[in-house]
């Protein structure tokens, strides 16, 4: 609570710097928060700092699809007898008709994802019960605290493996797994919490059944953690400037490009709007 306002945010110009000799307070956030600042400081500001928060656009069809698949792959483990067919039926239970072009498009994609989840589970998704399902993990590195939720954590003969489900049309590659900052940070957090090495990370593309994987080393994980700390230092400086100057801060430029067409906050960003027309809610599923 802010001493200046009695509420959760301070009046611009009243932020207090740490006392001399005192360590910097922890900067806490998720991998998504770090990537938001890296990708577009303007979106980061609107999403995490501006209060009241700008209204976001309604959910897109591919998000509705992804949520249904993730929910089904989580809830299948709560069934008395988890089976591939039962997991597929859970897609129907979790489905929401939000963002689709019309009921027919929603129906087609629901059937596709029901079949995809069934096939994924039949191909080995039920081989062993995970150590964690949508498990929250966290670690602290100096003045950085990272916390996030992993889709699945496996113990494969003593090896801890971080698994992330993907449902987009693009099939991930091993290089995607290698370069993923979130996966590496989740692995570092698992290692810290379980006190056992967690070096393997995997992207499971549910629609195709493809698995992209990378085996980190302790050194490569350390480099990813340092990358996160570098982003955090820049974000911390921007946060402090926002606390002092509010909307007058110049440390949150809009990074314009193709992603502006998909941004949930583009209605509040003139630069993003000028980058090109907005994509329809169902555009990610359009070529079906």
Regions of interest found by a model, annotated:
Residues 68-134, 140:
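A non-catalytic, helix-rich entry segment at domain boundaries
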Residues 1-62, 281-288:
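C-terminal, charged and often intrinsically disordered regions of DNA end-processing helicases
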Residues 189-288:
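Metal-dependent nuclease catalytic regions and adjoining charged, substrate-binding loops involved
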Residues 135-230:
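Mg2+/Mn2+-dependent nuclease catalytic core
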Residues 58-63, 103-110, 253:
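Conserved phosphate/pyrophosphate-binding and hydrolysis machinery centered on Walker-type P-loop NTPases
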Residues 30, 129-135, 146-150, 256:
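Short beta-strand or tight-loop elements
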Residues 61, 65, 69, 109, ...:
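Hydrophobic (often cysteine-bearing) scaffold residues that line and stabilize catalytic clefts
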Residues 41-48, 159-164, 236-237:
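Active-site-adjacent bridging/hinge elements
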């Amino acid at each position: 609570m802010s001493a200046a306002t009695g509420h959760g945010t301070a009046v611009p110009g009243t932020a207090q710097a740490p006392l001399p000799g005192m360590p910097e307070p922890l900067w806490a956030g998720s991998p998504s928060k770090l990537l938001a600042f890296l990708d577009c400081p303007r979106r980061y500001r609107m999403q995490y700092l501006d209060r009241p928060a700008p209204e976001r656009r309604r959910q897109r069809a591919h998000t509705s699809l992804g949520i249904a698949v993730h929910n089904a792959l989580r809830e299948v483990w709560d069934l008395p007898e988890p089976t591939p067919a039962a997991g597929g039926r859970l897609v129907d239970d979790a489905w929401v008709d939000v963002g689709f072009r019309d009921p027919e498009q929603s129906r087609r994609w629901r059937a596709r994802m029901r079949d995809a989840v069934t096939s994924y589970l039949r191909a080995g998704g039920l081989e062993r019960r995970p150590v964690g399902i949508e498990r929250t993990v966290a670690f602290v590195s100096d003045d950085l605290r990272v916390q996030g939720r992993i889709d699945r954590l496996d113990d494969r003969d003593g090896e801890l493996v971080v698994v992330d489900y993907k449902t987009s049309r693009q099939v991930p590659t091993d290089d995607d797994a290698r370069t993923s900052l979130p996966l590496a940070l989740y692995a570092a957090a698992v290692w810290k919490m379980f006190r056992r090495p967690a070096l393997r990370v995997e992207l499971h593309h549910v629609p195709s059944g493809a698995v992209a994987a990378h085996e980190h080393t302790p050194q490569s994980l350390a480099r990813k953690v340092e990358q996160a700390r570098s982003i955090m230092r820049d974000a911390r400086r921007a946060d402090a400037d926002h606390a002092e100057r509010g909307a007058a801060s110049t440390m949150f430029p809009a990074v314009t490009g193709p992603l502006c067409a998909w941004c949930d906050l583009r209605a509040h960003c003139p630069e993003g709007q000028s980058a090109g027309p907005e994509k329809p809610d169902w555009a990610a599923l359009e070529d079906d």
